[in-house]
Design a protein with these regions (language model features):
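Short beta-strand edge/turn micro-motifs at domain boundaries
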Residues: 104-132
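Residues at secondary-structure transition points
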Residues: 6-10, 50, 100
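Exposed beta-sheet edge and beta->alpha loop/turn motif
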Residues: 89-113
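Hydrophobic pocket/interface hotspot
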Residues: 19, 30-32, 39, 51, ...
Length: 133
């Protein structure tokens, strides 16, 4: 009988995608299960969050909702962890009801022992919001 081997790079990518799906649905309790102790999210401008609820509260005055269209996931094995890069665009609705779309983003995740250690976020949302105000 052949034993199936799970590719660790594919597994890391799938963990990130499942986490992103739960975050998009704002199922924070389920999303928390993907996180390693000490997990941190770092957003543009150096804004750092260690609690998902804190990030969700921070986002409330920025937009009503946001979703991601994924272009690709790139995965690289490091010496102590796997790094998953997620590329795409954001779309959603500002708090005034105006729709937005095509906002570029890149997220970089560090995955170790099947858990997310950190997430670094880069996007053009702040630049677009500044133009609208």
């Amino acid at each position: 009988m052949l034993e199936a081997k799970i590719d660790p790079l594919v597994l890391a990518r799938d963990i990130v995608r499942a986490y992103l799906d739960t975050m998009e649905a704002r199922d924070l309790a389920r999303a928390r299960r993907f996180l390693a102790p000490g997990f941190a999210m770092i957003f543009p401008g150096g804004r750092r969050f260690t609690e998902l609820e804190e990030m969700a509260e921070w986002a409330k005055p920025r937009y009503r909702w946001v979703k991601k269209r994924y272009e690709r996931f790139d995965v690289a094995q490091g010496t102590t962890a796997t790094h998953v890069y997620c590329f795409g665009t954001l779309y959603g609705e500002w708090n005034d009801g105006t729709a937005f779309e095509s906002i570029r983003f890149i997220d970089r995740f560090t995955v170790r022992a099947g858990k997310l250690v950190d997430q670094m976020v880069w996007n053009d949302m702040g630049e677009l919001a500044a133009k609208l105000n």
